[in-house]
UniProtKB/Swiss-Prot annotation:
This is Glycogen synthase. The lineage of its organism: Bacteria, Thermotogati, Thermotogota, Thermotogae, Petrotogales. ADP-alpha-D-glucose binds at residue 15. Its EC number is 2.4.1.21. GO terms for molecular function: alpha-1,4-glucan glucosyltransferase (ADP-glucose donor) activity; alpha-1,4-glucan glucosyltransferase (UDP-glucose donor) activity. Pathway: Glycan biosynthesis; glycogen biosynthesis.
């Protein structure tokens, strides 16, 4: 079985969010499990800035997408995912993908639709024996639409099965109906049984309806998106396709997130004593009061309400009355950036606010915190809670999506559980849960050590995830063949 993994972002070449981490890791583990897999992505401008492309192999030049009206030629460059033998093909054209922000909204439909058609041309020219295409989110969702319209009679492409992985259903790709002509797609697709959605073209809807199989990135999220609360208007068609909808939990790359070998952290972590060394080193590094008994709480993520940053901001004044420290790393909504920066002036030894994204600092925070805060409004999977547990940091979460699937409530009676959580999206519930965690950290030291050990024993490696994706590829292929 040969699989094409198609993504608009792939780490480390181009990264805007968690999708890039998945796309940069999962194919390696699928390859290690014995399947033939390769990756396709656009050649974004920053790749040329950050890599010596003379080391990339130019495998095709002068290709033109078959269906799309934008007939600018493209070249196909070939390299490998870091530390692996997984081939990655880059689609390079001089007229597109030159923004610093890869999701720059200017001409985003042109960029994504051109990429979808060009990816199919690349597959046909470079890997004609491909069996399955795994697409990701709305940016690649026109691939199955092209396959079931323009390429329906193509001798090579018509045999390929498709899987759509939804990483966040809140992003759907809504455009005026004229874009169908630009993409070279038939106008009959603009109807309620295809891509039409309240007078707009909904690209993700097309991916859902035209793919053989759909999956999302946690079992709970697969159920949630079939409800009005979480479905963002697509719950109806997801219910219709519920038999073809699966949830597979993301993993994390243990070769990168390794508490024994991570070059970014202060000390290797094998024991709780090692954990405390990282904590006091982090306190010193950030200019906080150096004291291993203070509860160090951290948040790493985008400062948007989806991540629960509004709840966090509402409880900060009360939270800071306690013997705690708070570390934040991330960027986002300006009002939250400004609010947290202002707090540092009031509590300089209790708060460290870092309005940036810094991989080195992120690893240090995961390794040095006592509590990792993730009170998301919704969370398809979430990686931060897995990273934190990998380094023995206890997650406090809202039980939604992948957070519900990965964090179990600590029970002092049987000593099982990896964290603390709440259900209702309310600041009072968050504050109560945090105070409970702080109490266990400061007053129940034996229990806290148990939770630390439970976190360190959790297995979120991609080996398990890869096996489930391989099973899903086989299901998609059987469905395509009519079995």
């Amino acid at each position: 079985m040969k699989i094409a993994y198609v993504s608009y972002e792939v780490s480390p070449f181009a990264k805007a969010g968690g999708l890039a981490d998945v796309a940069g890791a999962l194919p390696k583990y699928i390859k290690n499990a014995g399947e033939d897999i390769y990756v396709v992505m656009p050649f974004h401008k920053n790749i040329e800035n950050n890599y010596d492309i003379s080391k990339f192999e130019v495998v095709k030049t002068g290709l033109i997408p078959d269906s799309h009206t934008h007939k600018s030629p493209f070249s196909v460059y070939k390299s490998y995912l870091e530390g692996s033998s997984v081939v990655i093909y880059f689609i390079k054209t001089d007229s597109l993908y030159d923004s610093k922000n890869i999701y720059d909204e200017e001409n985003i439909f042109l960029k994504t639709s051109y990429f979808c058609d060009s990816a199919l041309k690349t597959i046909k020219e470079c890997e004609p024996d491909t069996n399955v295409i795994n697409i990701n989110d709305w940016h690649t969702s026109l691939i199955p639409v092209y396959l079931k319209t323009h390429y329906l009679q193509d001798n090579i492409l018509k045999k390929i099965a498709t899987i759509l992985t939804i990483h966040n259903i809140g992003y759907q790709g809504l455009f005026n109906p004229e874009v169908l002509n630009q993409a070279g797609l038939p106008n009959y697709l603009f109807n309620m049984n295809a891509l039409e959605y309240y007078g707009k073209v909904n690209v993700l809807k097309g991916g859902i309806l035209f793919s053989n199989i759909i999956n999302t990135v946690s079992p709970t999220y697969a159920k949630e998106i079939q409800s009005e609360e979480y479905g963002y208007g697509l719950e109806g068609i997801l219910k219709v396709r519920s038999e073809d909808l699966f949830g597979i939990l993301n993993g994390i790359d243990y070769s990168i997130y390794d508490p024994l070998k991570d070059p970014h952290i202060f000390h290797p972590i094998e024991s709780y004593e090692d954990k405390l060394k990282n904590k006091t080193s982090l306190q010193e590094y950030l200019g906080l009061t150096k004291d291993e008994n203070i509860t160090l709480i951290s948040f790493i993520g985008r400062l948007f309400e989806q991540k629960g940053i509004d709840l966090i901001s509402k409880i900060m004044d009360l939270l800071l009355l306690n013997d705690i420290q708070f570390v934040l790393l991330g960027t986002g909504d300006k009002k939250y950036e400004e609010y947290f920066v202002t707090l540092t002036k009031l509590y300089p030894k209790k708060i460290s606010i870092n309005i940036t994204f810094d991989v080195d600092l992120a690893q240090k925070i995961y390794a040095g915190s006592d509590i990792f805060l993730m009170p998301s409004k919704y969370e398809p999977c979430g990686l931060g809670q897995m990273y934190s547990m990998r380094y023995g940091t206890v997650p406090v979460v809202r039980y939604t999506g992948g957070l519900k699937d990965t964090v179990s409530e600590y029970n002092p009676k049987d000593k099982k559980g990896t964290g603390f959580g709440f259900h209702e999206y309310k600041e009072a519930d968050l504050l109560y849960t945090l105070m409970k965690a702080i109490y266990f950290h400061q007053k129940r030291k034996d229990d806290w050590t148990n939770i630390f050990e439970n976190c360190m024993k959790e297995d979120f490696s991609y080996e398990k995830t890869a096996k489930k994706y391989i099973e899903l590829y086989k299901i998609a292929l059987d469905k395509k063949r009519g079995y």
